[in-house]
């Protein structure tokens, strides 16, 4: 039985309409009893994986209509197709409206390249409202707005990718190729395939935004990184 949207929680799993996560990955995440939401056709994915969402959000043009009878306890939120944004944006707005503060996005990478690229930009677009990360069976992706510190095993591969233009004033600790008040520039200076040499890893950013792309480490360490508090820049 899924957690009801009326039950108090600030943590959600959101399933998109892209390539499905493994059943094991989803089961690991659901052990923490988050609110389970899906964006339109993500409902079909959840059905195939044997899970029932609390809420389905979108224009509902990609959902198997029989699921309304299969899931009588689920809430269905139809947002007009004319409303701006993708179904994933619509479910993120819904999550914010019901008090979600932190969410893991599944089924939003792979498949169509344009969808994957757009979904990555949502980590920035919703940064002031939601602490988001993207997870698939290979890696975890999250935005580093200013600084983050997390435990990681020695030898783990991670990458730092500028999200929107230059990222400057970057300083790292615990990596084979450290950065000290340096810049990463799209198409010029990259932060691809670095390696953990000491734990915890610390990453600080002066200006701009970075994406942290890190190999999955197993359920326990994945959840720790999902919960890691990234210090936000002053929005004032």
For the regions a language model picked out, list residue spans one by one.
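N-terminal nucleotide-binding beta1-loop-alpha1 segment
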Residues: 2-19
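Structural motif
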Residues: 11-13, 34-36, 54-55, 74-76, ...
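Short beta-strand segments
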Residues: 14-16, 40, 106-108, 135-136, ...
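Short beta->alpha connector loops
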Residues: 18-21, 42, 61, 140
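Short N-terminal binding/cap micro-motifs at the start of the first secondary-structure element
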Residues: 21-24, 45, 221-222
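Acidic/Gly/His-enriched mid-domain segments of enzyme catalytic cores or analogous surface patches
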Residues: 29-32, 37, 41-129
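Class I SAM-dependent methyltransferase SAM-binding "motif I" and its flanking Rossmann-like core
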Residues: 115, 122-153, 158
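Long, charged alpha-helical interface segments
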Residues: 144-236
């Amino acid at each position: 039985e899924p957690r009801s949207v009326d039950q108090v929680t600030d943590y959600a799993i959101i399933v998109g309409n892209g390539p499905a996560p493994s059943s094991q990955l989803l089961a690991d995440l659901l052990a923490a009893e988050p609110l389970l939401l899906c964006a339109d056709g993500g409902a079909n994915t959840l059905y195939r994986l044997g899970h029932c969402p609390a809420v389905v959000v979108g224009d509902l043009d990609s959902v198997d209509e029989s699921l309304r009878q299969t899931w009588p306890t689920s809430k269905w939120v139809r947002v007009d197709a004319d409303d701006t944004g993708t179904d994933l944006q619509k479910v993120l707005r819904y999550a914010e409206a019901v008090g979600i503060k932190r969410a893991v996005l599944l089924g939003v990478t792979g498949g169509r390249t344009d969808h994957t690229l757009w979904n990555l930009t949502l980590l920035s677009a919703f940064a002031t409202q939601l602490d988001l990360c993207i997870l698939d069976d290979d890696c975890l992706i999250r935005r580093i707005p200013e600084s983050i510190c997390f435990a990681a095993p020695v030898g783990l591969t991670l990458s730092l990718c500028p999200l929107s233009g230059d990222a400057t004033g970057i300083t790292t600790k615990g990596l084979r190729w450290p950065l000290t008040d340096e810049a990463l520039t799209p198409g010029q200076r990259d932060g691809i395939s670095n390696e953990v040499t000491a734990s915890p890893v610390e990453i600080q950013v002066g200006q701009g935004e970075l994406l942290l792309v890190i190999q999955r480490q197993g359920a326990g360490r994945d959840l720790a990184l999902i919960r890691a508090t990234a210090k936000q820049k002053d929005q004032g």
